[in-house]
Amino acid sequence: MKRRRVHFAALLILAATTAGLLSQLVLGGSDRVRIGNGSVSALTRSSTAVDSLPDSVLAYPFAARNFASKNGEGSRLLRLTGTLRLYAVPGKEGMLCLIEVDDAAGTAGGACADRHVLLTGSIYMADRQEDGSRLVVGLVGDGHTYAEAEDRRVPVQSNAFVLRGVDGSSVTVGSPTAVQTIDLGD
């Protein structure tokens, strides 16, 4: 009986050690650089009329599934670049959403993630363009000062960046003291 307890305890310790090792390998460990505390100061500023999401965006099933409120309450316009508008929207269960609206193309899209993603990366979208390049837009936490791809650097403004004509498969976001790489996939 005593031998079984010892074996069980050893097996339990081995399982815990294996789980810890796998979580570090799969989820990342100390190699994940943190920039800032994950806060988004753009969401704390006073709301104005331009911060309201278009009705067409609120009508999407995506909005009902992901936004914290059905009318997108708390949304903030982060960037306006030509006909492209980027919004941050509080999401359900601690999520935060990035919404991209292109008035000229008549399109809108969105991505949501847990706010903790902003500690080690970005909530982003990488849209394929007609020329094969990507339009990469992202929402980052406070502390990020730039986004870069292929030796082209753009400033982060109001917690957002816009990188046009990205041909590679990664984008770098950073601050004067730290850098993070975002893999865009295929």
Describe the residue ranges of each PLM region.
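Terminal targeting segments of Actinobacterial cell-envelope proteins
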Residues: 1-4
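Hydrophobic membrane-insertion alpha-helices, especially the h-region
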Residues: 7-25
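Extracytoplasmic low-complexity, Pro/Thr/Ser/Ala/Gly-rich segments
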Residues: 25-104, 181, 186
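Generic beta-strand structural signal
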Residues: 79-80, 89-90, 140, 156, ...
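Short, surface-exposed beta-strand/loop "edge" segments at domain boundaries and coil↔beta transitions
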Residues: 93-110, 143-147, 170-171, 178-181
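A short, polar/proline- and glycine-enriched secondary-structure boundary/capping micro-motif
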Residues: 107-112, 158-160
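Extracellular ectodomain segments of secreted/surface proteins
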Residues: 111-140
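Ser/Thr-rich low-complexity repeats and stalk/linker segments
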Residues: 145-186
